[in-house]
Amino acid sequence: MHTESTLDTTQADRTTLRPMRATDLPACHAMSLHLHWPHRLADWQFHHQVSSSWAVEQEQPDGTLNVAGSGMLCRLDDDYASLGLVIIADALQGRGLGRAMMQRLLADAGSRNVILNATEAGRPLYEKLGFVVTDTLSQHQSTTASAPATLPAGTHIRPLRPD
């Protein structure tokens, strides 16, 4: 059973770790866009459906609640799980929220071997939790130019076929 818990941070943080709701996904997606991650909202929705998903919620001075962190663990089978989409808002980093999120996700993994795809920013925390780098991946992103509105005379576009 998943329950909410007030995180052990300063009183001013007013944060809670709770199961993620579908209504949190646009805010999670916005956090990933802020980090220049390539995930679409549809990717977040898919991962939420197949994963144990958690959110850090922060109460603002006016009483409104904002999603300020995320993390997901997908159980691949009885032996393996994949952990990712771990984000803590910039303003809350360095307060132990990333560690609390990781501990919650690792508890959800149980005895499974956990695979973690992560950014360099989280590496110090992940290594403190026992993760070791086994390989690295470089990600390249670009924005594509729009196709011209009209094709030059005599130019045709057709489906590519093996014939």
Regions found by a protein language model. Give the residues of each.
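Conserved catalytic-core motifs of GNAT/GCN5-like acyltransferases
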Residues: 113-117, 132-146
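Solvent-exposed, charged amphipathic helical/linker segments at domain boundaries
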Residues: 145-157
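Short loop/turn motifs at secondary-structure junctions and domain boundaries
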Residues: 44-50
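Helix-loop element at the rim of GNAT/NAT acetyltransferase active sites that forms part
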Residues: 22-25, 30-42
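A short beta-loop-alpha structural element at the N-terminal edge
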Residues: 14-27, 154-163
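Conserved beta-strand in the GNAT
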Residues: 55, 63-74, 81-87
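Conserved acetyl-CoA-binding loop-helix of GNAT-fold acetyltransferases
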Residues: 88, 94-107, 124-128
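Conserved GNAT acetyl-CoA-binding A-motif
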Residues: 81-83, 108-120
